[in-house]
A protein has these predicted regions:
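The feature marks the mature, well-folded catalytic cores of soluble enzymes
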Residues: 1-210
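Short, glycine/acidic-rich beta->alpha junctions
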Residues: 19, 219, 268-271
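Residue-level detector of anion-binding/catalytic polar loops
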Residues: 37, 223, 273
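Short glycine- and Lys/Arg-enriched binding-loop motifs that mark or flank ligand-binding interfaces
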Residues: 115, 217, 267
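Short alpha-helical basic/polar micro-motif
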Residues: 117, 225, 275
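Acidic/polar loop patches that form or flank catalytic/metal-binding clefts of enzymes
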Residues: 151-153, 167-172, 225, 232, ...
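Ferredoxin-type iron-sulfur electron-transfer modules in oxidoreductases and energy-metabolism complexes
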Residues: 187-214, 229-300
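Phosphate-binding glycine-rich loops and their immediate beta-loop-alpha structural context
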Residues: 217, 221-224
Length: 300
């Protein structure tokens, strides 16, 4: 954030995986330690931020909370009369967040895909929060992991169709935005400064081992929705950023099997996760590899 010189930061995410990246590197903690206020702008993430809870799903981060719990939370945090209707809760959050957008020095988004052909970053949302975050503050920072890079725009839009259909059952999300650099002299709006942070954080090591197929993951969350273990336990039981079958494979790679060794055992090997995966990642096979590694190291 030194390059931005920000006093107030707004964070928005192109998808929940992008939000997960900032959790992976503890970005919010770093910003707060440097007197920069981060504000989540995805509605689910905003709810979790003011409640002090971690997300439980990579697409619907607050799916574990009921409407009544959110009503209680807004009443405590915002004051005023208790709001009972979902539309009223959304309107209250919109009113508060709109002021944060206008006050922000820096907008931080993720990217669902980065296009090598054009140097573009693509975000998809159903709330429009990423679009406001990249367009209103004077500086826009994109944070994305290296497996988000695809060769061409055609490749990106093929994957975007898979992502929307597997994540929310839509043909396309409500907002799909392609960003290619800061605004030009002739542009009336857009950020004056544009930066892309490409995060490795152990992923390049996966290219040379048996878990490289995990890098195909587009973070749709379908594997979680069909996993009997995830449905029974919820996302918080997985203990770190990434829940469900994809987390059971990815987490041991990122934080070490010695820290994440229980996760590959959180599976019935029913195969549903592989069946619904739009990019056909063999998740049961990869969890079995981790179990073999756990046995080899005698981790119990």
């Amino acid at each position: 954030m030194e390059i931005a010189g920000a006093q107030t930061g707004i964070q928005a995410y192109g998808d929940a995986e992008s939000e997960a990246l900032t959790e992976e590197i503890a970005l919010n903690d770093f910003l707060e330690a440097n007197d920069i206020e981060p504000v989540e702008t995805d509605l689910g993430e905003y709810i979790l931020q003011i409640s002090g809870q971690p997300p439980s799903h990579i697409i619907g981060p607050a799916v574990h909370m009921t409407k009544d719990e959110i009503s209680d939370l807004f009443e405590r945090h915002h004051g005023g009369p208790r709001l009972e209707e979902a539309s009223d809760l959304v309107a209250a959050a919109r009113k508060i967040l709109r002021q944060q957008y206008l006050a922000a020095d820096v907008g931080i988004t993720g990217a669902n895909f980065l296009v090598a052909e054009t140097g573009s970053a693509i975000t998809v949302t159903n709330e429009g929060n990423a679009e406001l975050t990249q367009g209103l503050p004077r500086t826009h920072i994109v944070i994305a992991s290296l497996e988000k890079v695809v060769p061409t725009m055609e490749d990106a839009f093929t994957l975007l169709r898979l992502l929307a259909r597997s994540a929310t059952g839509q043909e396309f999300t409500s907002y799909t935005t392609v960003m290619t650099g800061p605004k030009r002299a002739v542009d009336l709006d857009g950020p004056a400064h544009f930066h892309v942070v490409l995060l490795d954080n152990g992923r390049s090591q996966m290219l040379g081992n048996e878990f490289r197929e995990m890098l195909r993951c587009i973070r749709c969350g379908a594997c979680m929705n069909h996993c009997p273990v995830y449905v029974a336990t919820g996302g918080h039981a997985y203990g770190w950023v990434y829940p469900g079958p994809m987390g059971s494979v990815l987490t041991p790679q990122l934080i070490g099997i010695e820290n994440g060794f229980p996760l590959p055992n959180a599976s019935t090997f029913c195969g549903r996760c592989e069946q619904v995966c739009p990019v056909r990642i063999p998740l049961p096979k990869l969890m079995r590899h981790w179990r073999e590694e756990q046995f080899r190291r005698q981790l119990t």
